[in-house]
Amino acid sequence: MQPALAPHPSAQDHADQVLHDQLLAAQHQHLTHPQQARPQPPAPQPPHMQPNTPARDQNNIDPAISGATMLTGPPQTPTQPDVTGQETPKTYGKRPLSTSKRAAQNRAAQRAFRQRKEAHIRELEGKVKAYESMGEAIKALQAENYQLREYIINLQSRLLDSQGEVPELPGNIDLSQPRSEIPVPPIPNSGTATTTAPPPTAPQQPQPSHAQAPTSNDDMNSLNRIAVAGLGMRKPPTEEANYLGNNFQAQARRVRPDEGQPEASELPKQEQTHGLPLIS
């Protein structure tokens, strides 16, 4: 039989080198990551995997190295999560998601803005239509107001004409008695004896006091014509012509008082031809 061979010295050197490298790696990891938790010690190797080294070889190992190795054990590199590999898909997945969400929010905001704008435009259009209708109503009221003003002015002029004061007749004059010198009004073409007074003008302002004399004379002439028409009396053509001339002059003075005509006080007194006595 051949004797058992002793272990080769290169195996011992290899084990020492491995332990030394593991110790240096553990120290470097501890310095670079002080806050990181200490990794769990590895499971003990089965006895058949351990090298068959005698006690004398183990005693030759540096005690500092052997103590650190026994305390820390063979370090294992902690499995750190692949930050780049995991964050890249998240970032790539979040960006399209956030962009699509932002786009949806922008579309919703634009839609709400368009709705508010359309509602505001409709409200303004309604106000414009209301203002236009109010303007038409105001114009109609103004036109009606002008018409009513003209109507009121016309009524006032007629009221002044109808309420003109007629002077009282003297006590010694009786219009019911026939007189030969009473003028006879002109007979119209239709053959009737009734005549109408000329249409009165529509004065906007009351006439002065000095212009009341021709008006009172005209009123007297109107009363005389009514009385004569009721009695059916006639006069010669000469007296009728004189009466017509005097009546035309009185009307001309009343219608055009401001066209260079003298006032009533400056006109020469003319003898009345109505047949009534003059009272001074």
UniProtKB/Swiss-Prot annotation:
Subcellular compartments: Nucleus
Signal peptide: none
Keywords on record: DNA-binding, Nucleus, Transcription, Transcription regulation
Pfam families: bZIP_1
Entry's Gene Ontology molecular function annotations: DNA-binding transcription activator activity, RNA polymerase II-specific; transcription cis-regulatory region binding
UniProt-annotated stretches for the region Disordered: 1-102, 169-280
Principal cellular location given in the protein's record: nucleus
Keyword DNA-binding: yes
Extent of Pro residues compositional bias: 39-49, 197-206
Region (Basic motif): 97-120
Record-annotated bZIP domain positions: 96-159
Region Leucine-zipper, residue ranges: 124-155
Regions of compositional bias (Polar residues) in chain numbering: 79-89
Superkingdom, taxonomy of origin: Eukaryota
Any GO CC annotation of this UniProt entry: RNA polymerase II transcription regulator complex
Annotated family: Belongs to the bZIP family.
Function: Putative transcription factor.
Protein name: Putative transcription factor kapC
